[in-house]
Amino acid sequence: MIHIFSSKGQVHLDGHKELSKNEPVVEFMPEKVLIPAVDNKGVALANLVEVGATVQKGSLLGVRQDFQIPVYSPVTGTVAAVVKVMSPVVGRPVNFLQITVEKEQGEEVKLAPLASDDKESVVAKLKEGGIVGLGGAGFPTYIKYNTKDPIDTILINAVECEPYLTTDYVEGIERISDVFLALPALLKASGAQRVVIATKADKVHLIEAIEKGIA
């Protein structure tokens, strides 16, 4: 049997979480950003915004062709160029949109609020929001809920095993109320009977935030 920490070739890395776990999330506004113009397999986005176009934070940049998932701009600015950049996800150079960021970001383009918490409405809103997994595959969240198979449990993974990373931990503390705000609609749409929020036992402050949210 292979053991994750003691088998040959396995290494237990130090977490180094102390470097950032007590730091607040701050907004960093660079002079330019690079947004992939392809999906996680390297296929070009459909309906891609043209070079020279002005975009707003939250405006549509393009659509993934495989699952028809929209990709939105994280900033307000101008599409300056399409450049080839090495993609750690695709594993080769691919096209990226280079957006010059405006100093004044203005209002964000926001989606209309969820009108109903029935399954069809929630699935449609998850798709419209472009919500996907962050593990590299970019698998659309709406597909997980758009199933005929019974769903017993919604699992929210805040374990964050990777060294140095504390995004889930800090965001969980600062924005746990957003999680609980969304859960009723997700529970109704999925038909799940329970929710499990997974984290590590030593993440005391996150556990306290979760327990406070439950109370």
Annotate each language-model stretch with its function.
Residues 1-215:
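Well-ordered secondary-structure scaffolds
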